[in-house]
Amino acid sequence: MLVTSPPLMPPVAVPASLDAFLAGIGPRAFRFAEAGLRQRDDALDAVQDAMERMLGYRERPAEEWTALFWSILRRRIIDLQRRRSFRLKFWVPQEDHDQDSTIDWADEAPGPAQTHEQQREYALLVQALRQLPARQREAFSLRVLQELDVATTAKAMGCSEGSVKTHLSRARDALQKQLEATR
């Protein structure tokens, strides 16, 4: 099931340069931003802004880049969400924003039936993630989907490690209930 703990990964080597770090984290950052913003263009803007801001921190030790980048990206996503809700609050009903979010499916290797099932399960997961409170969604995305450790997730979210564990536990419980209800 999708809400179980991921297998322990071997320690990731520290990238040799900031360019290599940004190139490696870009696709995951885009998926994270797209899940939070629900619009492809806004997600691309948020990731680009976060990468540009990271250039100002290139002198920091490479071990700090991961937590720093996710923290910058998370704050940028929150800023864009606030601006969008303020600007569009009076002009467009909120329901219309969810209708135009599309998902790209790049994996062509599996057969049609398997691809359809993966798409359905992913759509259910995305829908369930969108129903979570923001902090629980962030904790789940950073900890499980992005495979960050608890300390790095706590730094990125600006909270304690205990809060990360609490948010993650509640997110997993809620996701498991929602996903079991759809089966």
Task: Label each residue range with its predicted role.
Residues 1-12, 16-18, 89-91, 155-156, ...:
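C-terminal edge and immediately downstream basic/flexible tail or linker adjoining helix-turn-helix-like DNA-binding
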Residues 2-31, 35, 41-44, 60-61:
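A short, charge-rich alpha-helical start-of-domain segment used by transcription regulators
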Residues 11-12, 49-65, 83-85:
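Sigma70-family region 2
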Residues 16, 98-127:
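Acidic, proline/glycine-rich intrinsically disordered inter-domain spacer in sigma factors
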Residues 29, 33, 43-54, 69-72, ...:
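Short, small-hydrophobic-rich alpha-helical interface motif
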Residues 74-93, 118:
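Arg/Lys-rich amphipathic alpha helix in sigma70-family domain 2
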Residues 130, 134-135, 146-163:
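Helix-turn-helix DNA-binding module
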Residues 139-143:
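A short pre-motif secondary-structure segment
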